[in-house]
Amino acid sequence: MTILLVTGTSTGVGKTVATAALAAAAVRQGIDVTVCKPVQTGDDHDAGEVARLSGVTRVQTLVRYPEPLAPVASASRAGLELLDHTQMATAIVALDRPGALTLVEGAGGLLVELAADGKTLRDLAMVLDAPVLVVTTADLGTLNHTALTLEALAVQSVPCAGLVVGSFPAEPDLAQRLNRENLANQFGTPVRAVIPEGAARLMPPVFAELSIELFEPQWVAGLVA
């Protein structure tokens, strides 16, 4: 069994589409996939989008807070408590199965408080002893944001499973073209996929075919080897 956490260098970088794409690619290789969203704020759109695009039927949100804000703010305004991160970890382990892949999509970036006592997705990764896949962009500023996220993982010895560019335009500008190259060369961390802008608007069968092309099959298979 394998647990892989998915985070972003910020919010809105394409974590959900990246999670769906990796899930779809794994399903097409015959891998049993579960997707978990430990914390959702606002509506439950992310889980529904992952299920729609990937075809994965085991998609679970552990807790949802009503307003689309940072988890601690949304929980506070609703008069609700944040879950303990060890509770989250226990629930995630219970979802995992032998020979299966469990993808855990975080909320916002790596150090967003999503559990009680200020705990973050990084803390959850440490409890689970699981690697983290980092979704980033090719936009101006991404090299700094990516470096900060990778450094935050490294300082706690949390392994990084690679980078994914969550949305790359069909007609990139100069900064986007150069950043795509620099993301691949600057950090010593492999870029696992570059997802075309607008991929989420594809019909699910087309999205699944694209996903197979985006991720190296050997890497995907190796996640549960």
Swiss-Prot record:
Keywords: ATP-binding, Biotin biosynthesis, Cytoplasm, Ligase, Magnesium, Metal-binding, Nucleotide-binding. It catalyses: (7R,8S)-7,8-diammoniononanoate + CO2 + ATP = (4R,5S)-dethiobiotin + ADP + phosphate + 3 H(+). It is found in: Cytoplasm. It is an enzyme of class 6 (ligase). Disulfide bonds: none annotated. GO terms for biological process: biotin biosynthetic process. Homodimer. This is ATP-dependent dethiobiotin synthetase BioD. It comes from Mycobacteroides abscessus (strain ATCC 19977 / DSM 44196 / CCUG 20993 / CIP 104536 / JCM 13569 / NCTC 13031 / TMC 1543 / L948). The gene is bioD.
